[in-house]
């Protein structure tokens, strides 16, 4: 679903949100059919992340080499000399890019916020009110057998706007699922727990290669959620070399058993995760 950024008028007092994608009728992120909103920004830089462009506050320019026809209109349009051709190959100097979008406007194979374009700026800034106007027709279609899922990135990094969105959805009785790494402060989780029907708890960094320093904090967050009778679905990505090891799985099993979490979701690793690294110019960390 393409979310259209709209000019904010004086009557719209709702909070602004940054997001990079919206999926309608998803069946993988909560019960039933879901409208899934992918929010921009993440405090965790997982080696296996398949959306590295979601991590910064604003996503970098994505370049799909296979969709480029070599017309060179971007070269003429960009005053910062971001685009250049060397021996027929389209190269991008990302350090000079100010994300103005002029190159996208001139590219015949690009639309500013559409995946698959030759050039693409994924991050969209929109108010909560404007976002709801665009997604609510889909929510009404699926409200009896689905709901809304807030994913990312890490949605709760935009706390004030997320609270406004959650409060509206709660008032409308839409089922609300929220995905998190569990690495934010317990105070943040305490503020929104009454508004969330299901926590999709991504076990991204606990134990294993980089997780030791985070173990105690994740345990504290789980303790707090369990005490508030929150419904939690732990989700474990089966990443080769990280979460498919016996020692890691045993540690996770002990943690889940300690908190009486008897149902887990083992998510298959996205083998095509390298696509967004290629398009964003962000170096891959996986060995």
Q: What do these predicted ranges mean?
A:
Residues 6-12, 41, 120-122, 170-173, ...:
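N-terminal start-of-chain detector that recognizes signal peptides
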Residues 55-194:
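Conserved Radical SAM active-site core
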Residues 1-75, 80, 85, 97, ...:
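Flexible, acidic/Gly-rich N-terminal and inter-domain linker regions that tether
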Residues 277-287:
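A structural motif corresponding to the C-terminal lobe/cap of the Radical SAM core domain
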Residues 129-278:
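Conserved AdoMet/S-adenosylmethionine-binding subsite of the radical SAM
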Residues 121-125, 211, 215, 287:
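Flexible, glycine- and charge-enriched loops at secondary-structure boundaries
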Residues 6-14, 113-115, 208, 213:
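Intrinsically disordered, low-complexity coil segments
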């Amino acid at each position: 679903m393409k979310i259209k950024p709209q000019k904010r008028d004086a009557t719209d007092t709702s909070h602004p949100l940054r997001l990079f994608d919206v999926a309608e009728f998803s069946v993988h992120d909560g019960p039933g059919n879901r409208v899934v909103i992918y929010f921009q920004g993440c405090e965790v830089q997982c080696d296996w992340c398949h959306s590295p462009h979601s991590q910064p506050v604003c996503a970098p320019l994505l370049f799909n080499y296979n969709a480029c026809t070599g017309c060179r209109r971007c070269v003429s349009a960009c005053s910062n000399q971001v685009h250049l051709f060397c021996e027929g190959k389209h190269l991008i100097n990302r350090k000079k890019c100010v994300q103005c979008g002029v190159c996208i406007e001139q590219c015949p194979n690009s639309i500013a916020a559409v995946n698959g374009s030759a050039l693409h700026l994924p991050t969209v800034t929109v108010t909560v009110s404007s976002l709801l106007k665009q997604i609510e027709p889909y929510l009404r279609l699926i409200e009896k057998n689905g709901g809304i899922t807030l994913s990312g990135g890490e949605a709760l990094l935009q706390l004030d706007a997320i609270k406004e969105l959650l409060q509206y959805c709660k008032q409308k009785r839409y089922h609300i699922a929220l995905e998190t790494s569990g690495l934010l402060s317990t105070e943040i989780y305490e503020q929104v727990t009454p508004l969330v029907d299901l926590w999709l708890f991504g076990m991204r960094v606990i134990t294993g290669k980089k997780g030791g320093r985070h173990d105690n904090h994740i345990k504290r967050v789980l303790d707090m959620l369990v005490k508030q009778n929150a419904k939690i679905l732990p989700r474990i990505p089966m990443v080769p070399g990280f979460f498919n090891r016996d020692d890691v799985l045993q540690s996770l099993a002990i943690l889940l058993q300690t908190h009486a979490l008897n149902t887990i979701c083992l998510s298959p690793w996205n083998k095509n995760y390298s696509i967004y690294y290629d398009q964003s110019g962000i170096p891959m960390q996986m060995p």
